[in-house]
């Protein structure tokens, strides 16, 4: 802004200058009593009102009425003060009716000045202003600095410069109003971009009247004042006019009295120019601030929309992951249920086989017992011919006992066959009940036939004992009944002194308990005790036999001495035979116990190997399942990551399209505004062109008239002041004048400093606010990015922890199942002795079949994986080609540099995150493969089926994705063709505009406008050419980036293919090593089995030899 100085700076020193300052500055002076007058002092208040106008191009109307008529001058002055505030002072209420005389009345005795002051003081007392064309008042608030006046610069061309003068009534009000109106109209046209309608001339004549221009300008100024503009205090400068002047005495006006001087036109124009310049600066700054605010709001809205989309995408991804987890859980449950049903069916089949085997073994044992029993019957018949008892009774008794025992054994076998999976306790209870029932039946029979049993001979008892020793004892299922019921028949049959067939059968049944490792010595000791007790009983019976024969059997024939000697010799030989038989029996028991121990060890070894094989198979299945799930999870994660990248690309392309559309809209808008401004500029030039000369003429005329009037007025006033001034008032007046000068200077300096400080503060505040908003936006953006990274990291760690927890839970559950299975197998181990041969044969057959099947499946899996690898490579190539095309089409649309930099940053971040994830996944896969190298041997069958199904599904998905990508490619090509058509249309439109501009340049007659238009067209052409060059550079850069990305992707594909080939080779090698290990274990088992069979055959041959030797003796 221009520098300001006080209008009183050029006042000459002296009393005249002081008097002029007193009459022009509008200061309130409260005068006391005159020294030589009896009238009281009057209060006096004057106001200076400056109208707001713009002097960009000096404007005024023709001087129509410059006469001296007071009514017309007052009316013009009222019109000129249409936008001026008339402020009433706060101390007017203190003025009384006695102080109503104007202070100028001391110097001017005519009624002219009083009449003019009265006409000015008749204005509204409620601080109102009037419009130009109507008399409706408008209320304005009173500013705090109502007494302050704005200083104005004086032109440098003027030699003589007077003090500041008040606005007189004869100042050409129309000229000032017209200039202000035209200046404001030009300002509104040139600098107000909010108005869209250009000014159009009237239909009567091509130039609008000044009154209409003044009215429009005043309305605009009023709206600016109501909206709180900063120029309000600069446009309205007024002092309060006391209402006490209405009661001042009036004297008749002398026609020859001179009028007061006016404010010069140059000062008013400079002041108007300063005010309008300040208003233009403030409006421009406000528009820039509003535009930046709107741009920031749009950026924030876009960021919020993108964040909302990202949240929705995350929610959808979470839903998809949950559905996939549910599906995987359902599949796991179905697989577990199938495995459980398969195990149950296998157990049932095994139990049925064992029951059949036990029945067959039982039948074979019965047949052997029957076969051994018949020779005993024949020998007994031959040897008991000399006994007095009848053989029919003995035969009947033996048959009865045999029938009972056989029936009991049949019951036991039936129970075993019916419930093979029952508990050992239930079997032991059934066997105990059968034994107790058989014992009770034997007791009844023994009570009935005790007399017949006592008459048996020693030879018959010896033969029964030999037959019992020759028979192989059968084992019971429970050893608990051993201590309770095994030797109960000895205690219960205290009356019988010899072994009967019933006792022998009962002893055979009770001695069928299995030989325990810790109870073998007890079993042999019990048998030895039973044999020794039997021999003692035989000796007692031999000693008691002669007495019983001689006394009790009167029907027998008395033996001779020779027969007695023979009998004694036979008894001695029998004692020797029994001793040797006891020794042999003990040795046989020891051998049998060793054979049983070896058989149990062999069975346990076989069961252990079978169990190990099953456990390894389960573990391999489990590890294969885990590997499959992990691979599927990683593949799914990579697919989701790729989908996310595609979605990000789509979002970025949409944003680019939106930005392009906005740029087009802004371009169209500004082209319209440029056209409107050109039309307005033409209209202004049409309006103001012929007025410039008139304004210059009016300026010259005004300056001449003003000089003459000012000189006359100064001379008259100096004369009046010299004549009327009282010497006693001069010192007081001088003091007041100096005091008011100082106050005015201070107020002006303070006001200027406050205005400058306010402008600086406002500018600094808004700059600071914009910087703070920009910094806050950057900070929020960085915080949001960091927060998103932290959330992604936490989500990844949480997912990893969940997967590890699930893996640990599955591992614990499987360990628990394995332990339960081991316990169950240990419980069922006692029932699996009869299945060793079948299991061996089945194991050999299954191992051979499994080896062949594994070889075939390995060949198939290798072929299938090679085929799948080729298909995947082909699909990846097609997908990469499609993505390359879509990427090129998307990146051709990007025109702004900040979008490109942002996209590169996002690409780098995403690439780093993807590389980190890929590295982590590769490391995790390597660790998992290293851990699972020794556990993937028997997983080929189910694996190939599932892999085949999975890859068929993947092929379907790939075909579907290929179709969708082809559709997207077609759509993008259509969009590209549309954009090319749009570009052609815009080029044609540009050519049309250039043609129109050239036509307009030919039509227009003014060289200045034609040059401006040509320069504008050249600027537009240059801008368009620069934009085309930028687009070409952008396209080249995009092509380079696409080629680099293609090369990187090709390298990555090659690396992935190499890794897959290495993994396949490693899997193939591991499978081969697993098969070789399996074959080695099978060969070792086969050799061990053959050695065990040979040992068993050898032991059986030894037992057979010993049995033959015993029978031969």
UniProtKB/Swiss-Prot annotation:
Keyword Transport applies: yes
Phenotype caused by lack of the gene: Morpholino knockdown of the protein leads to truncated cilia formation and impaired intraflagellar transport processes.
InterPro entries given in the database record: CEP131
Any single GO BP term: epithelial cilium movement involved in determination of left/right asymmetry
Location in or out of the cell: Chromosome, Centromere; Cytoplasm, Cytoskeleton, Microtubule organizing center, Centrosome, Centriolar satellite; Cytoplasm, Cytoskeleton, Cilium basal body; Cytoplasmic vesicle, Secretory vesicle, Acrosome
Compositionally biased intervals (Low complexity): 238-257, 446-458
Domain IQ residues, every copy: 276-296
Role, per record: Cilium-specific protein required for the regulation of cilium/flagellum formation. Involved in centriole duplication. May play a role in melanosome trafficking.
Protein name: Centrosomal protein of 131 kDa
Origin species: Danio rerio
Gene (name only): cep131
